[in-house]
Amino acid sequence: MKLLASPFLLLLPVMLMSMVFSSPNPGVARSHGDQHLAPRRWLLEGGQECECKDWFLQAPKRKATAVLGPPRKQCPCDHVKGREKKNRHQKHHRKSQRPSRACQQFLKRCHLASFALPL
């Protein structure tokens, strides 16, 4: 009986920690994964107002037009930062040419949607 109880007692703290870190209650504990929910939440709430095909065809930037009604959110890939003016401290202040995390998730979702077969 003692042999069966000792492995269970060793696994008990691990199980409790995994339950605490995966808790949906934000007041209990937050794991590092919770920090990345904001872009995903933005995408799930319908923040995407652009079409996937625009990004895969490398369409030119759309001009902002005045639209009556509630303001629309822009595509997450509209704000990719370009190169900045060179300065003498360029090595220390390089900006990443990578798109933002929200843009990467948007492109990944569009890419996966392009593989989806119509029913």
Curated annotation (Swiss-Prot):
It is found in: Secreted. Pfam families: CXCL17. Residues 1-22 form the signal peptide. GO terms for biological process: angiogenesis; cell differentiation; chemokine-mediated signaling pathway; macrophage chemotaxis; negative regulation of inflammatory response; positive regulation of cytosolic calcium ion concentration; positive regulation of ERK1 and ERK2 cascade; positive regulation of macrophage chemotaxis. Disruption phenotype: Mice show no defects in breeding or gross anatomy development, and they gained weight normally but exhibit a paucity of macrophages in the lungs. One of its GO terms (molecular function) is chemokine activity. Residues 75-100 are annotated as: Disordered. Residues 82-98 have a biased composition (Basic residues). Likely to undergo an endoproteolytic process to form a four-cysteine-containing mature peptide with a canonical CXC chemokine scaffold after secretion. Belongs to the intercrine alpha (chemokine CxC) family. GO terms for cellular component: extracellular space. Detected in lung, trachea, lung, tongue thyroid, submaxillary gland, epididymis, and uterus tissues and at a lower level in ovary, prostate and in intestinal tissues. This is C-X-C motif chemokine 17. All the mice injected with NIH3T3 cells over-expressing Cxcl17 develop rapidly progressing tumors within 21 days. Disulfide bonds join 75-103, 77-110. InterPro entries: CXCL17. The record marks 63-64 as: Cleavage. Chemokine that acts as a chemoattractant for monocytes, macrophages and dendritic cells. Plays a role in angiogenesis and possibly in the development of tumors. Acts as an anti-inflammatory in the stomach. May play a role in the innate defense against infections. Activates the C-X-C chemokine receptor GPR35 to induce a rapid and transient rise in the level of intracellular calcium ions. The keyword Signal applies. Keywords: Angiogenesis, Chemotaxis, Cleavage on pair of basic residues, Developmental protein, Differentiation, Disulfide bond, Secreted, Signal.
